[in-house]
Amino acid sequence: MSKNVVVIGTQWGDEGKGKIVDWLAESVQGVVRFQGGHNAGHTLWINGKKTILRLIPSGIMHPGVTCFIGNGVVLSPEALLKEIEELEAAGLDVRSRLQISEICPLILPYHIAVDQAREARKGEGKIGTTGRGIGPAYEDKIARRALRVQDLFNPALFDEKLAELLDYHNFVLTQYLGAPAVSAAQVRDQAMALAPAIAPMVKDVSSNLYAMQQAGQRLLFEGAQGALLDVDHGTYPFVTSSNCLAGAASAGAGVGPQSLDYVLGITKAYTTRVGSGPFPTELVDEIGTRLATIGKEFGSVTGRPRRCGWFDGAALKRSVRLNGITGLCITKLDVLDGLESIQLGVGYRVNGEFRDVLPYGAHAVAQAEAVLEELPGWSESTVGITEYAKLPAAARRYLERVAEVCGVPIDLVSTGPDRNETIVLRHPLKG
């Protein structure tokens, strides 16, 4: 029996992590975000009602669960408070159940200005960021110049650090990117106006998570984006600016790695990608359009259409190794309903040689030709099925082949957007 579970996306994000975290949150006392910012949305459907969370952990939907934003998250005070207000308007108690690490780096207006100006300057060569300032905020963190949440409550120190930051960022904006400068007074006034609303939620998250573990309580660590977008191990440079792997939960929440008992890898039954970057199994035909239409493949935060393709087992194998995945959850199986045949990526041809795992770096991946294996499809609907034996035989064979290719068992299968539309083969927290 596992006490603490890490939920990770194994592809290029958008795998359906939010629903699964929400479902698992019924069995834990705390849910922790440990990386990313408000650039990724987790979509939940509860009794037919749609909720999109960007910063706040998906456990907020459960009254008895405490939610944490760990130090690995870059925090926009404005985006946070807007999301809190939206949830409160829907009748949820948020502020008494949300704790924010005092050492989270802040996202401020100059980060957004730099992010958007850079993308505009690159034109067709752009990375495809969301333009929300995530990357520049992480840059400040690594350069050891970031303003952090705790600085909001020390105005003199805030002003001192802000002056130095804007000397640098305004030089880049005006002299290199050809964009307007950002006003220090406006940044300061906005931040100081928001600080009192945030103050009661600011805590020593690491210590509080330690105390919960000492009391025998269970924790769920909620990853954002996906392993193939990891800044180190993803299709660099077409990646996000943080580490999206299971190991990042330790550093990004302030807990010891021995606290991570089980890693659940969330995997779509096909593959999607948003924005630029190589995609070996991409479909640019009517089947790709069908997957996008039936799967409603549009970003929950940006609204951008997602590129669609066949399931890539060799890419999943890379994710399995990087994350030490214990078990898989396959989502959106129902999107494949009605296809006469289905193809599954088992490797690549690279310079005439077969490779059974995704290469490193965007250039190498772009040179890789997917090796596909054809399996029979199924005509029956899988929507809402909650027992594995009731799935069509061809759907079961497809899932079994996925597990064979990546070498990890499938513990959960999602057959619809609602939390109850789930097949449980092995419960991550109950065995």
From Swiss-Prot:
Q: Which UniProt keywords apply?
A: Cytoplasm, GTP-binding, Ligase, Magnesium, Metal-binding, Nucleotide-binding, Purine biosynthesis
Q: Name one GO biological process term.
A: 'de novo' AMP biosynthetic process
Task: Please name the pathway.
Answer: Purine metabolism; AMP biosynthesis via de novo pathway; AMP from IMP: step 1/2
Q: Which cofactor does it need?
A: Mg(2+)
Please state where this protein is localized: Cytoplasm
- In this chain, Mg(2+) is annotated as bound at 14, 41
Q: Which InterPro entries match?
A: Adenylosuccin_syn_GTP-bd, Adenylosuccin_syn_Lys_AS, Adenylosuccinate_synth_dom1, Adenylosuccinate_synth_dom2, Adenylosuccinate_synth_dom3, Adenylosuccinate_synthetase, P-loop_NTPase
Q: Quick one: which residues bind GTP?
A: 13-19, 41-43, 306, 332-334, 414-416
Q: Where is the active site?
A: 14, 42
Per its UniProt entry, which superkingdom is the organism in? Bacteria
The residues that the entry says bind substrate are 300-306
Q: Which PROSITE patterns match?
A: ADENYLOSUCCIN_SYN_1, ADENYLOSUCCIN_SYN_2
CDD domains from the xrefs?
Answer: AdSS
Reactions catalysed, as given in the entry:
IMP + L-aspartate + GTP = N(6)-(1,2-dicarboxyethyl)-AMP + GDP + phosphate + 2 H(+)
Cofactor stoichiometry and binding remark:
Binds 1 Mg(2+) ion per subunit.
Output the Gene Ontology terms for molecular function: adenylosuccinate synthase activity; GTP binding; magnesium ion binding
One GO term describing the cellular component: cytoplasm
- Enzyme Commission designation: 6.3.4.4
User: Subunit structure, briefly?
Assistant: Homodimer.
Summary of the function given for this chain in its UniProt record: Plays an important role in the de novo pathway of purine nucleotide biosynthesis. Catalyzes the first committed step in the biosynthesis of AMP from IMP.
PANTHER family for the chain: ADENYLOSUCCINATE SYNTHETASE
| Family of the protein in this entry | Belongs to the adenylosuccinate synthetase family.
NCBIfam families, A to Z: PRK01117.1, purA
**What name is this protein filed under?**
Adenylosuccinate synthetase
Q: What is the lineage of its organism?
A: Bacteria, Pseudomonadati, Pseudomonadota, Betaproteobacteria, Burkholderiales
